[in-house]
Swiss-Prot record:
Name of the protein this chain belongs to: Arginine biosynthesis bifunctional protein ArgJ, mitochondrial
Function: Catalyzes two activities which are involved in the cyclic version of arginine biosynthesis: the synthesis of acetylglutamate from glutamate and acetyl-CoA, and of ornithine by transacetylation between acetylornithine and glutamate.
Species of provenance: Neosartorya fischeri (strain ATCC 1020 / DSM 3700 / CBS 544.65 / FGSC A1164 / JCM 1740 / NRRL 181 / WB 181) (Aspergillus fischerianus)
GO term, biological process aspect, one: ornithine biosynthetic process
Gene Ontology MF annotations: glutamate N-acetyltransferase activity; L-glutamate N-acetyltransferase activity
Known pathway: Amino-acid biosynthesis; L-arginine biosynthesis; L-ornithine and N-acetyl-L-glutamate from L-glutamate and N(2)-acetyl-L-ornithine (cyclic): step 1/1; Amino-acid biosynthesis; L-arginine biosynthesis; N(2)-acetyl-L-ornithine from L-glutamate: step 1/4
Similarity comment: Belongs to the ArgJ family.
SUPFAM superfamilies: DmpA/ArgJ-like
Modifications the protein undergoes after translation, according to the UniProt entry: The alpha and beta chains are autoproteolytically processed from a single precursor protein within the mitochondrion.
Source domain of life: Eukaryota
Residues under site feature: Involved in the stabilization of negative charge on the oxyanion by the formation of the oxyanion hole: 145-146
N-terminal signal peptide: none
Active-site feature positions: 224 (nucleophile)
Keyword annotations: Acyltransferase, Amino-acid biosynthesis, Arginine biosynthesis, Autocatalytic cleavage, Mitochondrion, Multifunctional enzyme, Transferase
Length: 456
């Protein structure tokens, strides 16, 4: 048995982060070679050695604005909220979403379920950053990620925060290094940026950047994993909170890797207004509507990178539930399918076992009465190459499935599952009803290996 354990821990992993942190060739395509970053934001990634085994890689991220920001965040609903979650919520509440200057993040230790001492550690991290910024009031959001139930090596972190502050920069390399600093079992840093315009200022260009981490313990409930977004657009705090909540509900709250909701889940956004223009404040304004679409689309792209880096994952799966009487029922059904171990393992095995999908639909809890009617439910696979859908079930009646074509479809990395609650031709034409989309990955042997020796 001991020999077997040594063999497992020494084996070559195809999908998890290599010991030298080199980005796998298959994931290189997700790494941006340049970016359009918001004005007035500076970032750095610094090595601390939070985990003793980490002797050289960055594990402390610092994101700072040269001017005070409006800020908003959504946090985990896990009852065991980590110390940084509790501290950051208090900071945002006391500041009413105004005057925030920085976000500091350590990887390697979650600082969760660590008692009074853990709370003191989280406070001290934020306070140290504030001191570096010459501030006396709490103005920093704190995040941590890693192993639960262990105290931070807080002295090491506090000693390196001034170094992180000195190294702040606005270059693409700095942003990429910062994104790498928040990774744990991730195989690649997740960083995106884009420019946009608003209806009130068509000649003014704004920028939006975001980084996220996560590969396991991913299933949302108000927020998921860690994410930081920054924009130089001017947005009032109350509007920023509603914009983020909407965006997260349709992005970070619509992904699943393994069905576990972390103790540390936090997604935050900072808006410093450095690009000028009139502040976005009223939900009735054209600028608000445009910003909602921009932020939601951006958050979806960012959150999908987490699924593509799911621990041991070999597939990126979109499940689209359409023709539902309401959005929430469609979302619940999509979520149930996405977290079904039987669905996920069938996809890994390239098995077109649509009965597992139907089973998940049938046991979904909380949907509106009359949402799921077997006689009008249809399920199909939609290939990524644009070829016709492969019908599996139509109006509750099984189709004669072309197993050979199904196998070809399931060999692809990307796949879409379409569930039509209205049935048949009506659903295919997209007539009527609400639609929800969820993104998830498969379960492989590698997932068990990664999580079986996570702490070692």
């Amino acid at each position: 048995m001991a020999a077997f354990a040594r063999m497992v821990k020494g084996q070559v992993r195809n999908y998890s982060a290599p010991l030298d942190m080199a980005i796998p060739a298959s994931k290189q395509k997700y790494i941006p070679s340049s970016g359009s970053y918001p004005k007035g934001f500076l970032v750095s990634g610094t090595h601390v050695g939070v985990k003793a085994s980490n002797t050289k890689f960055p594990d402390l991220a610092l994101i700072s604005s040269e001017t005070p920001c409006s800020a908003a965040a959504v946090f985990t609903t896990n009852k065991f909220q980590a110390a940084p979650v509790q501290v950051s919520k208090k900071t945002l509440e006391s500041r009413q979403g105004q005057g925030i200057r920085s976000v500091v993040i350590n990887s390697g230790c979650a600082n969760a379920v660590t008692g009074k001492g853990g709370l003191e550690d989280a406070v001290s991290m934020g306070k140290k950053v504030d001191e570096c910024n010459g501030l006396s009031e709490p103005s920093t959001i704190v995040m941590s990620t890693g192993v639960i139930g262990q105290r931070l090596p807080i002295s090491k972190i506090l000693n390196k925060i001034p170094t992180a502050h000195e190294n702040l920069a606005s270059t693409h390399d700095a942003w990429l290094t910062t994104a790498r600093a928040i990774c744990t079992t991730d195989t690649f840093p997740k960083l995106l940026s884009r420019t946009f315009v608003l209806p009130s200022s068509p000649g003014r260009t704004y920028s939006l950047a975001g980084m996220t981490k996560g590969a396991g313990m991913i299933h949302p409930n108000m927020a998921t994993l860690l994410g930081v977004l920054c924009t130089d657009a001017p947005i009032d705090p109350s509007a920023l909170q509603s914009l983020l909540t909407h965006a997260v509900s349709r992005s970070f709250n619509s992904i699943s890797v393994d069905g576990d909701t972390s103790t540390n889940d936090t997604v935050a956004i900072l808006a410093n207004g450095a690009a000028g223009g009139a502040p976005i404040s009223s939900p009735a304004s054209d600028d608000y509507t445009a910003m909602q679409d921009i932020l939601t689309s951006f958050a979806q792209s960012l959150s999908q990178l987490v699924v593509r880096d799911g621990e041991g994952a070999t597939k990126f799966v979109t499940v689209r539930v359409q023709n539902s009487p309401d959005y929430e029922s469609a979302r619940l059904i999509a979520s149930t399918i996405a977290r079904s171990p039987l669905v996920k393992t069938a996809l890994y095995g390239r098995d077109a076992n649509w009965g597992r999908i139907l089973c998940a639909i049938g046991y979904t809890q909380g949907v509106a009465p009359g949402t799921v009617v077997p006689e009008r439910t249809s399920v199909s696979f939609k290939p990524v190459d644009g070829s016709p859908v492969l019908k599996l079930l139509v109006n509750g009646e099984p189709e004669q499935v072309d197993e050979e074509r199904a196998s070809v479809i399931l060999q692809e990395e990307d796949l879409e599952i379409v569930v039509d609650l209205g049935g048949g031709e009506k659903g295919e034409q997209g007539l009527g009803g609400e639609e929800a989309v969820y993104w998830f990955c498969d379960f492989s042997h590698e997932y068990v290996t990664i999580n079986g020796d996570y702490r070692t």
